Curated annotation (Swiss-Prot):
Cross-referenced Pfam families: Transgly (PF00912), Transpeptidase (PF00905)
Lineage: Bacteria, Bacillati, Bacillota, Clostridia, Eubacteriales
TM stretches of this protein: 35-55
Gene3D superfamilies in UniProt: Biosynthetic peptidoglycan transglycosylase-like, DD-peptidase/beta-lactamase superfamily
Gene name of the record: pbpA
Annotated EC: 2.4.99.28, 3.4.16.4
Stretches for region Transpeptidase: 381-664
Parts of the chain on the Extracellular side: 56-809
Region (Transglycosylase): 74-251
Keywords attached to this entry: Antibiotic resistance, Carboxypeptidase, Cell membrane, Cell shape, Cell wall biogenesis/degradation, Glycosyltransferase, Hydrolase, Membrane, Multifunctional enzyme, Peptidoglycan synthesis, Protease, Signal-anchor, Transferase, Transmembrane, Transmembrane helix
Family that this chain belongs to: In the N-terminal section; belongs to the glycosyltransferase 51 family.
Positions of region (Disordered): 694-809
Name by which UniProt lists this protein: Penicillin-binding protein 1A
Keyword Calcium: no
Annotated localization: Cell membrane
Amino acid sequence: MSDNTKTNSRNKSVKRTKKVKKKKKFGFFKKLFTILFCLFILLSVAASGVIFAIVKTSPNLDINGTILNLDQPSQLYDDNNNPMDTVVTNQRRYVVSIKDMPKNLSNAFVSIEDERFYKHSGIDTKRILGAFYNDIKSKIHKQNSIQGASTITQQLIKNRMFLNDSLENRISFKRKIQEAYLSIKLEQSLSKSQILEAYMNTIFLGVQANGVEAASRQYFNKSAKDLNLIECAFIAGLAQSPSAYYPFSQNVAKNPNIYLDRTKLVLYKMRQNNYIDFSTYQNAINDLNNNKLAFSQQKISNKYTYEWFSIPVVNQVKQDLKSQYHYTDEEIDSLLRDGGLKIYTTMNTSMESNVQNILDNNSTLKSYSYADKNGIIQPEAAATLFDYHTGEIKAIVGGRGQQPPSSYNRADSSNYLRSVGSSIKPLTVYAPAIDTKLATEDTIVNDSPLSSDVAEKYGSNGVPYNPHNDDGGYSGPVNLKTALTKSINLVAIKLEDKLGLSTGAAYAQKFGLTLNNDDKSSIAALSLGEIRGSNTTTMAAAYGVFGNNGLYSEPRLYRKVVDKTGKVLLENNYSTRKVISPQSAYIMYDLLKGPVSAGGTGSYARFGDMPVAGKTGTASDSKNLWFCGLTPYYSAAVWVGNDQPTKLSLGSNDVAEIWGEIMKMANVNLTVKDIDAPGGVTKIGDSYYIDGTSPSNLSGDDSSSSTASKPQTPTTNTQNNTNNNVANPNSNNTTNSNTSNSTETPAQNTQQPTPTPTPSTNNTPGNTNTNTNTNNNTNTNTNTNNNNTNNSSSGNNNPPNNNTTNTNK
């Protein structure tokens, strides 16, 4: 074989080998491609399955309930249905229509946040794929670099449906898939204008601002409709990172280019998208360079406009929501903060403002005013104005002058209680005595020291109880009308002893007072007001009973609460309960005209021709001064004292004067009238009596015989002490010219008491007492221990010491 032939043969063999190798190589790649293609199909199917599963588990798209129904703080309205306050929260949102927003504002947001907003159908494919790729890299490299590529629609979905999840887990493929799916659905249901409006009302723009209206007020102290171009651009620029561009932070204030450059970028994008022309753009840039972006920082306050009233209202609504719907505290807070509730209160805005003005500017209070170490004006004062016909509280003022947020509400708080002094006497002594028919207006009680057995009964640690009157003297036999007019302590104590402490305590609680066990067992607490404490709201409601036929009107701070759909959640209807009979209430109203008459302890309470009735109270060695009373229209209570209890230089009549100023304001333009006497009441002379009672059968002393029926008390525990120096219709150990004695004779006293005159035409008690009981009623104990003084506001809740020398008025 020739060489050429061999060579050709080898070449052919090589070619065949190469061809075989090529076939094998092609077969390998073919198999690889097939495998990869199959894997791609499998992965695609799997991915589709995963995506389908994620989409399937997406939350329901509640457009009206979630997307368009924007969170707003609850609003409070006054008694004329005018807005008066907004529930204080850490967020502010004011929902406005896109029609009331500048076109530049919406264009600025679209330009910087989603320039293809009007072209896409919920998602911007180009941007979302880029963001998806960037997020994968961040996951792999454990970086925290997030590309903000969501459309405005997606941002709205996130803010309304995934906000908490987005804050806790910023990179979440599941959430992004669901956001994209729900965004497409939302675009199919709402117009672009509706979506943009919802977005601009929800976007967080720094500190308390949620939405453009809140941001406009926060940064420029104006409404969004009044924003100029550069202000619109600034607000739109905040959306990316509100804290980074916050102009009032220390760092940004030192380097304003941080927010200026961002604002310029927004303007550039607006120009690029043809929302503004070049000339407008250039003028805006020049304005920025010339410092024409002028901020007017709105003071951020957590204080209510009418804090004294609004806080009690909100607290009451919380309690009632919890009671009626069994909401948790967190659910209630969320509902009040974001639920847009409408709370219709009972507050009269004019009355509230006027009461505050009176307490702030009363000339007597101002003459004694000073600022304490915390800058709080002293002495403090509080007042409550109450419509006892409806149960509506019209005004609550818990302090004078400027107060920090959430200050002590001295008018309504259960944590700021003060002893009420003699203003308790009508509630626990005189009204029970009249209502149980133990006494009448003209029942005679001897104003004299306690008998030894009574003093010992209420003594402490072996020391007899030795109370005094304010002036240190005694008036001898006086009727109830005189005793109440002059606020005679000894008469109140003797009546309370005859009633029994349990009876007095039972009536106190019926009048709405809160007593602890020490109060219930203390003669000083129940007859002289040295209780743990009360406030003006409680006392105003209690005194309303005397003008309301004996009915206690439950105090109401609000009428109803309505949710944002118009559904009534709470309805606070007027309700009453019986405390005393209508006849007893009217007689007490008549008796309470005494203290405000000439010579009474509260004569300064009178104003004009409107009838008034009330009682002063001086407690804790003149550390607490009160006046409580009523007109035919309203009842009210006023307290004056120092936050750190110290003796005041004012008197109870000064507080009566303040009360008179408040009532003059409240009753202005009202018809002058008096309360009508109910049936079952008879007038004899200047006094009123419940039918079936009269001076002749209800007056007497400890040792007199009487035909009167036994007192009917609300409890079964009535103490009857035969040495208490009060008319006792059930005692029969005296000799008297009549079957019932109106004159009380002191036991063991050599001085003969002045006899009660015999009535002429039934106008005075008709019994002349000839009893010369020689029991020694003069108590020589002069213990002046003042442990009975109760300063509840300073945390002293010790029981009153019954051997105190009391000088309450």
